[in-house]
Amino acid sequence: MAVAEGSSGRPRAPVRPDRNLALELVRVTESASMGAGRWVGRGDKIAADQAAVDAMRAMLDSVSMDGVVVIGEGEKDEAPMLYNGESVGNGAAPEVDVAVDPLEGTRLTALGQPNAIAVIAVAERGTMFFPGAAVYMEKIAVGPEGLGAIDINASPTENVNALAKAKSVSPRQISVVVLERDRHEDLIGELRQAGAKVNLIRDGDVAPAIAAAQGGTGVDMLYGIGGTPEGVISAAALKAVGGGMQGKLWPRNDEERQQLLDNGLDPAHRA
């Protein structure tokens, strides 16, 4: 805390330094990572996730913001903290929407594998996309070269060719990350038929989505169906680093589809 003197020579009130919200949020994710870090390789993904949640929630209380969790650990009756609608921060300006995933990749952590991360995204109040009942969404994530080239409504072959053209490379030089799931069998086959290299991952698609926008990672595109909360957070991260993402909500059944339609969210349209 700094103290300045007035023109009379008398000390003025203490001058508090401006607080940088981005740096404060780094401390939040750092705390969550350190909390989960004690559980790396110990085979208990539930304990790892809880440690990350506890650490992130405690640190959020010190952040200078008036935040509301839009995407969190679930509804209030499902999660004791970081639930959807919970107020976080110390109540000071700015007013923001908050999306959190204290530990993205709980199984990766439990198994001692890489690419588990703690993530948080903030946006001006009322601007964070809320996916409603949608648990999953179709996603395509790319770097700056892919902006304007990809189309979630186009075929995988068309998107591989479009990205290759935008990056001035052969389709055989395009590397695509896909979650290893049965639902992706046709997608994987078409991507390979188009000439792309397919890197399969078991869990955690936020890290490779961000990697698609960073040079030297060996990732050109993330493709496929994954969690909607992770999709929103990935989109925020990609926007910050100059990449891009397109997505469509992917209802698991007719009941979920109707819930989305009732809330004004049409799964047939890009989110």
Please place each PLM-identified region on the residue numbering.
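N-terminal subdomain of lithium-sensitive/metallo-dependent phosphomonoesterases centered on the IMPase/IPPase/PAP
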Residues: M1-A99, N161, K165, V206-A207, ...
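Anaerobic metallocofactor- and corrinoid-dependent redox/one-carbon enzyme cores
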Residues: E24-G35, W39, A47-Q50, P80-M81, ...
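General beta-strand structural signal in soluble alpha/beta enzymes
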Residues: V69-E73, V98-V100, T109-L111, F130-P131, ...
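Acidic beta-strand-loop-alpha-helix segment within the catalytic core
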Residues: V119-I201, Q258, N263-A268
